[in-house]
A protein has these predicted regions:
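Membrane-embedded alpha-helical bundles that constitute the cytochrome b-like, heme-associated redox core
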Residues: 1-151
């Protein structure tokens, strides 16, 4: 499930639009709405699944600040992963309503861009933490990555 989301997110990045004017193509606008809606639905399912069935793989000896950093990073990733399609849907709605420019559109576009920027940093931090745990050989890596398992 984790790696499926990685692929879905990367696809979303690769197919992103370069300009709001591209949304004048109604088939592209519809595709963006469907993609964002499906992404949000799958994100919600994943969030519920993870919160109800999974426990942290951090060892009990993990320092409290590190546990807090992991929680902040994970929750921040979920928030950004939700905000990106939500703000994208709002951009599409505003565009569809004819509000292609103006303060409201600029605010929503700014929130969208900020969410994307923050998720890049959080993903980087997530990867650094995974590598740290791989080097530490404490079992966390093996719970995150399907290859190069710890012994």
């Amino acid at each position: 499930m984790h790696w499926g989301f990685v692929l879905l997110f990367v696809y979303g990045l690769l197919k992103q639009i370069d300009s709001l004017n591209q949304l004048e193509d109604s088939s592209l606008l519809k595709f963006e709405v469907v993609f964002a809606s499906v992404f949000l639905f799958l994100l919600l399912i994943r969030f519920i699944y993870m919160k109800t069935t999974q426990q942290s793989s951090l060892p009990e000896s993990t320092p409290k600040p590190q546990i807090m950093a992991a929680k902040i990073t994970h929750n921040g990733m979920y928030i950004c992963l939700a905000l990106i399609p939500l703000t994208g849907l709002l951009i599409g709605l505003l565009f569809w309503l004819g509000l292609k420019e103006g303060l409201l559109t600029n605010l929503v576009v700014g929130a969208h861009e900020l969410s994307v920027s923050i998720i890049y940093w959080l993903i980087g931090l997530h990867i650094l933490a995974a590598v740290y745990h791989r080097l530490k050989n404490d079992g966390v890596w093996s719970s995150m990555v399907p290859f190069w398992k710890e012994k």
